[in-house]
Amino acid sequence: MSEAPESIETSPVVTPDVAESVQNQGVEVVQTEAPTEAQVVKTKSKKKRTKDPALYHTRKARIQVDPDSVNTDDRPPQTGTVYNIWFNKWSGGDKEDEKFNQKKADGRCSIARDSGYTRADKVPGSYFCLYFARGLCTQGHKCEFLHRLPVLTDMFSPTTDCFGRDRFFDYRDDMGGIGSISRVNRTLYVGRIHVSDAAKAGALDEIVSRHFSEWGDVDRIRVLHDKGVAFVTYATEVNAQFAKEAMAHQSLDSGEVLNVRWATQDPDPLAQAREQRRLEENAAEAIKRLLPQEYVDELEGRAKKSKPLLEGYEEDDSEKLKRIMNNQKEAGAEPAEEVKQIEPAPEPAAPVSTDTGMFNKSSLSALKALKKKKKTKAKVEE
């Protein structure tokens, strides 16, 4: 008996008439490498949205939640007289440890997908969007708050957090809430972490780092495996404030509901000294980024002197900054800061001098003449 021929899978064949009609409908026809005139029909793929959070200023902020799907009356049972939208509770009512507040969060922010520019980027000193951090913003690029991660140069008043909420002197008894103005706190307490078999094998540190490093630079992470607790320290306090709201009532990889609080102060003197040193470094780095780069190079000794100065004269910092901003004005660049000067009115008989400041042409000429006179007098005495 002869064997049955094996079935051969072939690509669908499209005639030229069908191919032309398909192209008119917005479908791309790709020529195959076969010697025949068979063609494969393939739909056009949509352009993917960039997921680089550093390019947030080149794209519009994404609407995280459809406004029509938001229930405006989604509130906890009324136990007070005034409803606080910031804390999702009634004044004098339920605590955060009750069952209602321990449910998993309705949304989660994704910096790579959701960040973008909003109306707030045009307003200096704008605050960050609290609902964006929670993944529940319905405004998108029309929002009046920032939709991005905080950076080192984002500085706010000590009496408010990065979302514009008022802070108080003392922490709450449960170390929750907005925080305190009594000290700079960069460390978060993360509780109720589910310790699975994989976590016991040593993967819990990687899991915590992967979830919390999305909200900014992390200095260190300490995980207590036997208690299901972690302490996450960020590089800046604003990143810790953002991460606290972003990870509140979220889960890691096991579906748990996290308990995120502010960490208490470490009593170790070495840890306190390390914290103080880190805060000073952050302040110096923030000031360095706000100053002109040429000025920073001169302060750190990396720049060459643009012109020779008089012997024995050392230019102070204010004169350096004025000279650098004058150079930026001459080059057509926008100066970092406007320096206001009061110039004396020119004499009618003398031409108007374009030089300003203490060491103009006439002053330098007088100093050179005085220096030459002193040298001549010293030679005569010898």
Swiss-Prot record:
Alphabetical keyword list: Cell cycle, Metal-binding, mRNA processing, mRNA splicing, Nucleus, RNA-binding, Spliceosome, Zinc, Zinc-finger
Entry's localization field: Nucleus
Main localization, broad class: nucleus
Xref: PROSITE patterns: RRM (PS50102), ZF_C3H1 (PS50103)
Residue spans, zinc finger C3H1-type: 124-150
Region (Disordered): 307-358
Protein's UniProt keywords contain Kinase: no
Listed GO biological process terms: mRNA cis splicing, via spliceosome; positive regulation of cell cycle; positive regulation of RNA splicing; spliceosomal snRNP assembly
InterPro entries: Cwc2/Slt11 (IPR039171), Cwc2_RRM (IPR034181), Nucleotide-bd_a/b_plait_sf (IPR012677), RBD_domain_sf (IPR035979), RRM_dom (IPR000504), Torus (IPR032297), Znf_CCCH (IPR000571), Znf_CCCH_sf (IPR036855)
One Gene Ontology term of the molecular function aspect: pre-mRNA binding
Domain named RRM: residues: 186-265
Pfam family, one: Torus
This protein's record includes keyword Nucleus: yes
SUPFAM superfamilies recorded: CCCH zinc finger, RNA-binding domain, RBD
GO cellular component terms listed in the entry, alphabetical order: post-mRNA release spliceosomal complex; Prp19 complex; U2-type catalytic step 1 spliceosome; U2-type catalytic step 2 spliceosome
Entries under Gene3D superfamilies matching the protein: 3.30.70.330
SMART domains attached to this UniProt entry: RRM (SM00360)
Quaternary organization: Associated with the spliceosome.
Domains: entry comment: The C-terminal RRM domain and the zinc finger motif are necessary for RNA-binding.
Biological role: Involved in the first step of pre-mRNA splicing. Required for cell growth and cell cycle control. Plays a role in the levels of the U1, U4, U5 and U6 snRNAs and the maintenance of the U4/U6 snRNA complex. May provide the link between the 'nineteen complex' NTC spliceosome protein complex and the spliceosome through the U6 snRNA. Associates predominantly with U6 snRNAs in assembled active spliceosomes. Binds directly to the internal stem-loop (ISL) domain of the U6 snRNA and to the pre-mRNA intron near the 5' splice site during the activation and catalytic phases of the spliceosome cycle.
Family: Belongs to the RRM CWC2 family.
Protein name: Pre-mRNA-splicing factor CWC2
Biological classification of the source: Eukaryota, Fungi, Dikarya, Ascomycota, Saccharomycotina
Gene: CWC2
